[in-house]
Amino acid sequence: MKILVLNSGSSSIKFKFFDNKIIKASGLVEKIGEQNSKVILKNVLNNESFERELTINNHEEGLSIVNELFKESGILADLNTLDGCGHRIVHGGRNLSEHCLVDDYVLKEIDRVSIFAPLHNPAHLAGIKTMIKAAPSVANVAIFDTAFHRTMPDFAYMYALPYDFYDKHNIRRYGFHGTSHAFVSSRAASLLEKDKSELNVISAHLGNGASVCAIEKGKSVDTSMGFTPLEGLVMGTRCGDLDPAILPFISHLKGLTIEEIDTLMNKKSGVYGICGYNDFRDIEREIEQGNDKARLALDMFCYRLVKYIGAYFAVLPKTDAIVFTGGIGENDSLVRQKVCERLAHLGIELDFELNKQRISGERMINHANSKVKVLVIPTDEELEIARITEELIGKN
């Protein structure tokens, strides 16, 4: 099947094109709504690139240029020849708990729950509507970041607030990075030559946004992110878990509005708030130069991660493997080492030489004596979206 995967942002469209699950092209429409917009399409098979620089006023114009570049490159004759298009959607809310084909109800529901993800869902919706207009005969599939976590039990996803907040306003823990956690847990099963239903995995997706997921027999039973992606780990610019009583205190102390506090927690906190950097390469360079705030930021990040992984050892009946993924999880050997050393009493023994090797691809980095496998698996959310899109179109 020919599947296009779209990740639509407020001023951008990222895309990948798969033919029978093999990536053929990838690209980006950036600076939508600006005069210096750019469209880039790369033929993955021969590294040939096709670019246009022009004014792109909206998503519809951007996708039209993408279609032109597909034709020019010879990769795809027309968007209408696709078998399907998979759309990454951050938040499905309470009612859209599973990936699904797009229809009028789905469009209305994605719009309705935009209040939960105001920076993401409206842009995703624009991407879907643009695709429907550009290629009306092509099936569109909505792939929700929240869907993988639909298997969490109620005692894991509920907040201890008055029940009406859940019943009437759908306030609960939803979890995110679901497509990534689903992908790497499946790959872990393949690497360990086991069926997903036989395996318990703790997946750590570590990027500028970061989350941990406890996966029992292929199903999410708990995850660190909650109602929004702000809960949980210390992240690049997000604070993660916080005593909620701090918020009214800060408001009175600094005279900040709710919106300003939201910006503070999401964009000015995390390791950036501690040391002024959110790129871990910069943080580790600063540590080498004696920057104690950088050292503190790294220690806080790793300590919170250790606490969550340790908690999920308690949640799962048995832990077979820990998976590191995301930009930091895949590339930062120091973070992996600091985390695994603190978890040694749980049967985790890292092979330090394997951990330090700067190689790409899936690999096992635990010592042969380790009771728990430690894996590094590069995530591929677009491939997972393409796979699910094919599966749902095939069923219908």
Curated annotation (Swiss-Prot):
It is an enzyme of class 2 (transferase). One of its GO terms (cellular component) is cytoplasm. Keywords: ATP-binding, Cytoplasm, Kinase, Magnesium, Metal-binding, Nucleotide-binding, Transferase. It catalyses: acetate + ATP = acetyl phosphate + ADP. It holds the Pfam family Acetate_kinase. Homodimer. Belongs to the acetokinase family. This is Acetate kinase. It comes from Campylobacter jejuni subsp. doylei (strain ATCC BAA-1458 / RM4099 / 269.97).
